[in-house]
Regions:
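Retroelement reverse transcriptase polymerase core
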Residues: 1-178
Length: 178
C-alpha cells in the first residue's frame, strides 16, 4: 500500500476545511448558568512557543480552526512524545465539567472480538485524524475556544479531549458501518 501511495501520491490530498459531507456534527451542550473556562496562558520556553505557533498556523491553513473573539477559552498543553516531537493538546477539563454527558453506547472490546470468531477475512482501516472529519455543530463552535499567545481560536472540527467526542465518533461509525 505504501508503494501505491508513493507512486500515485499526487492523487492523495490532505483534507482541508470543514468536511461538508458529514451529517454527524458534534454538539457541545452546556449546563445552564455555568461559568466558561478562562485561565491564564502558561509561561513557556521559546521552543514550545515556536511549536505552538507552527501548529496554530498549520490548523488555520487546514481550516480546522479560526480566530475567535470570545473573551475566554481553554488552555494549550504541549506533551513531548518519545521521539522528541510535540503533541498539541487543549486542556478541556473545565469545559468538560460543565458539558452535558451524551450516553450513546460504545461497544466493549471483548464483545467486538467475540463477533470475529470463526471469520476468515479481516480488514483494517486507519481513520487518520478521524475526529477532524467531524464538524462541530455551528452554533456550538464558540464553546471550544482556546487561548494562545497568538490570540484566541476555536475549532471548526472535533478536537481530541472534548467530553462526548468518542460517542459522536461512534455514532458516525455506526452510521457508515454495516
Amino acid at each position: 500500500m505504501d508503494k501505491v501511495v508513493e507512486e500515485y501520491g499526487d492523487i492523495f490530498t490532505s483534507p482541508t476545511g470543514v468536511p461538508l459531507h458529514c451529517q454527524n456534527k458534534h454538539p457541545i451542550d452546556l449546563t445552564l448558568g455555568a461559568p466558561l473556562p478562562n485561565g491564564s496562558i502558561y509561561r513557556r520556553s521559546v521552543l514550545e512557543n515556536d511549536e505552538i505557533k507552527r501548529k496554530i498556523q498549520e490548523l488555520l491553513h487546514k481550516g480546522h480552526i479560526r480566530p475567535s473573539s470570545l473573551p475566554c477559552g481553554s488552555l494549550i498543553v504541549l506533551v513531548q512524545k518519545k521521539d522528541g516531537t510535540w503533541r498539541f493538546c487543549i486542556d478541556y477539563r473545565a469545559l468538560n465539567k460543565i458539558t452535558v454527558q451524551n450516553r450513546y453506547p460504545i461497544p466493549r472490546i471483548d464483545d467486538l472480538l467475540d463477533q470475529l470468531k470463526g471469520e476468515k477475512y479481516f480488514s483494517k482501516i486507519d481513520l487518520k485524524s478521524g475526529y477532524h472529519q467531524v464538524p462541530i455543530e455551528p452554533s456550538d463552535v464558540w464553546k471550544n475556544a482556546f487561548k494562545a499567545k497568538e490570540g484566541l481560536f476555536e475549532w471548526l472540527v472535533m478536537p481530541f479531549g472534548l467530553t462526548n467526542s468518542p460517542e459522536t465518533f461512534m455514532r458516525l461509525m455506526d452510521d457508515v458501518g454495516p
